[in-house]
Amino acid sequence: ATYKVKLVTPDGPIEFDCPDDVYILDQAEEEGHELPYSCRAGSCSSCAGKVTAGTVDQSDGNFLDDDQMADGFVLTCVAYPKSDVTIETHKEEDLTG
C-alpha cells in the first residue's frame, strides 16, 4: 500500500506518497526534501518528529522508549507509514529537552 505523508517542517508543510515498505526519511529524500538525520539506524534522536495524525511502524528503531512513542514521537529514519500520516519534523529538542 502507499500512503500520503505530510511533514510539517519549520519551512512549511511538504506532502508526498510513501509506500508502506519505505522509510519516511528515505522517501522524503527521494522526493528532494532535506530533513535532519544522523545515524539512519534508529539509534539517535537527530531525525525525531512527532506524529499528529495517523500511524507508523518504527519497530526497527530502538532509541525511543515506550513513553516517548506513546507521546507520538517518531524516528523518521526507521518509520514506515501504516496509514495516511502527519508528522511534525525537527522535534529533537522537544524529545531530549
From Swiss-Prot:
Key words of the record: 2Fe-2S, Chloroplast, Electron transport, Iron, Iron-sulfur, Metal-binding, Plastid, Transport
Biological process according to GO: electron transport chain; ferredoxin metabolic process
InterPro entries listed in its UniProt record: 2Fe-2S_ferredoxin-like_sf, 2Fe-2S_ferredoxin-type, 2Fe2S_fd_BS, Beta-grasp_dom_sf, Fd_pln
Entry-linked SUPFAM superfamilies: 2Fe-2S ferredoxin-like
Location of the protein in the cell: Plastid, Chloroplast
One GO CC term, this protein: chloroplast
Required co-factors: [2Fe-2S] cluster
Pfam families in the record: Fer2
Binding site for [2Fe-2S] cluster: C39, C44, C47, C77
Cofactor note: Binds 1 [2Fe-2S] cluster.
Entry's Gene Ontology molecular function annotations: 2 iron, 2 sulfur cluster binding; electron transfer activity; ferrous iron binding
Residues annotated as domain 2Fe-2S ferredoxin-type: 3-93
UniProt record similarity statement: Belongs to the 2Fe2S plant-type ferredoxin family.
Role of this protein: Ferredoxins are iron-sulfur proteins that transfer electrons in a wide variety of metabolic reactions.
The protein's name: Ferredoxin
